[in-house]
Regions:
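Helix-rich, typically C-terminal accessory recognition domains appended to large enzymatic cores
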Residues: 3-147
Length: 147
C-alpha cells in the first residue's frame, strides 16, 4: 500500500478500501477502481479551488436545491452507517459532489457541512478544506473537533 499512498494519498486508499464492498464480504485485492475514488477527491478539491488552485467559495445563501442535496446525503450516510455499508457511504459522497458540481455550488455553508460529514472517511483533505472554509470566521477548530 505504500506505493499507492505515495501515488494517490492516504485518503484515496482509505476510501477505496471502503468502496470495495461490504465489510463482511471477501474482496480480492485489486486496484483497478482506485482512480475513480481519486477522481472523486480531485473533483471535490476543484469544486472549492479556482483554476490557479486558490481556495474559492461563495458567500451567498445556498439554494433549496443545494440544501436538498446536502440533506439527502446526510440522511443516506446515517442510514448506511447503521448498516455498516461503508461502500454505499462512499458512493453517496460521490453522488453528492456530482450534484453540487452540476449545481455549481461551492457555497461556504454547504461545503463546510459536507466536509464535516466526509472527515471521518477522508480526514486529510477534509482538514485542509475545513481550515480554508473556516479561515477568518472565528471558527478555526480542526475538523475532528467539530464532528
Amino acid at each position: 500500500p505504500d506505493e499507492l499512498i505515495e501515488k494517490f494519498g492516504a485518503d484515496t486508499l482509505r476510501l477505496y478500501e471502503m468502496f470495495l464492498g461490504p465489510l463482511e464480504q471477501y474482496k480480492p485485492w485489486d486496484t483497478k477502481g482506485i482512480n475513480g475514488v481519486h477522481n472523486f477527491l480531485r473533483k471535490f478539491w476543484r469544486l472549492v479551488h479556482d483554476h490557479e488552485n486558490n481556495f474559492s467559495v461563495c458567500e451567498s445563501n445556498p439554494t433549496k436545491e443545494n440544501y436538498k442535496t446536502l440533506h439527502k446525503t446526510i440522511k443516506k450516510v446515517e442510514e448506511e452507517i447503521e448498516r455498516y455499508s461503508f461502500n454505499t457511504v462512499v458512493s453517496t459522497f460521490m453522488i453528492c459532489i456530482n450534484e453540487l458540481t452540476d449545481q455549481k455550488c461551492n457555497n461556504r455553508e454547504i461545503i463546510s457541512d459536507f466536509t464535516i460529514l466526509l472527515s471521518s472517511y477522508a480526514p486529510h483533505i477534509s482538514e485542509e478544506i475545513c481550515f480554508e472554509v473556516r479561515k477568518n470566521t472565528g471558527m478555526q477548530k480542526p475538523v475532528h473537533k467539530i464532528t
